[in-house]
Amino acid sequence: MKLIISSLSALLFSGVILSAQMPGMVTMQQASASQGTSLGANTTSGAAGIALGNRVVMRGFVDFQFKYDDEDSNLTPGSGSQTEAFNTKADIDFLFDFSPITGEVHIALGKDDIELEQAFARYSLNRDFNFSFGRQLTALGYESDEQPGLQSVSNAYWLADRLAGNAQIGTAPKGPTQTRRNYKDGVRANFNNGKFGVSFGLHDGYWKNDNFNGDNIAIDIAASLMIVPGLEARLGYAQEQYDDQSGSSDNISQLNGWIAYQPGDLTLAFEFDNMDILSDEYWSMMFHANYQFVNWMSATFRYSHEDYEAMSVSNEADRLSFALLFSLTENFGLNFEYSTTSVDRLNVGDYDEFYVEGLLTF
């Protein structure tokens, strides 16, 4: 409770002392209330970026981060570990508009590998209805999958992805379970008329697997309503049946809902998640607040709670984050974040993180 009060006080105090505009600073356009939902929409046509001819647009970002973390152990009081690291990654997207056919290719570049994030095409039957097929971003979840859309440096949730990889039935699944938004192959039917959007997808895996072997198949459906300009509510459900090599079968399912309000400079959001991960159970909630004090500076306060029950053992995490985001030019931002996570597990205690990020967008 003291931590929550002190964090709220810090947010208010920072807003007071930093709300005066810095002279000579290059400014950006302030946020305005969103007029429509993006779920199911054709967001390729008319997208901003660097024009490479009449029908191709390129956009992307370079993300450079310094991270310091301090992890305490619950096993031995006073013990733990501290690490510091630099990390650089980049992302390049190519958008093609041959209306009524549009398409996108997203490439992620890290220091060790190059990954195809998304590669899909879309056929628009009319202004409101379209089909998309290929490797696409999954629909469930409030947080952006890429740094420029986060309004922070880190993600809200700490516990789920670290434990979900241990969920197993019969033969242990290979690799971790990505419980947040990721990229999967499949087909989607989409509808969007501005005020209301819906998307229904069929995939060869949503969290695990990448084939239709056995009964491995996944579906997801999400619907979004722009109640009034700036106030959006979204609800989605996804399920994947998982069959391992031993013949055992179980499901992974997720119910996700969020509501966001953005009247102008203020953004408020609340998200709730409930998942059955094979034989494990997981639920989480997140509150997100961002305020644009001036054109070149905003602040974000975020709180999340997670409860992960594996083999009747409950693991909980409470995470508080505070970020200051500075737009030095239209294309370059300098961001700072402090996050502290209280973890109720046998071998992990408090976990503190500090980030400095330079973010170039184009």
What positions do the PLM features span?
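Transmembrane beta-strands of outer-membrane beta-barrel pores
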Residues: F64-D70, K89-D91, F98-P100, I107-K111, ...
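N-terminal periplasmic/intermembrane-space "pro-region" immediately following the signal or transit peptide
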Residues: I5-L8, F13-D63, F362
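Solvent-exposed loop/turn segments connecting transmembrane beta-strands
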Residues: L52, E84, I107-L116, T179-K184, ...
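Detector for outer-membrane/organellar transmembrane beta-barrel domains
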Residues: K195, S224-M311, D318
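Flexible, surface-exposed loop regions and adjacent strand-edge segments
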Residues: L75-G80, P148-S154, A317-R319, E353-F354
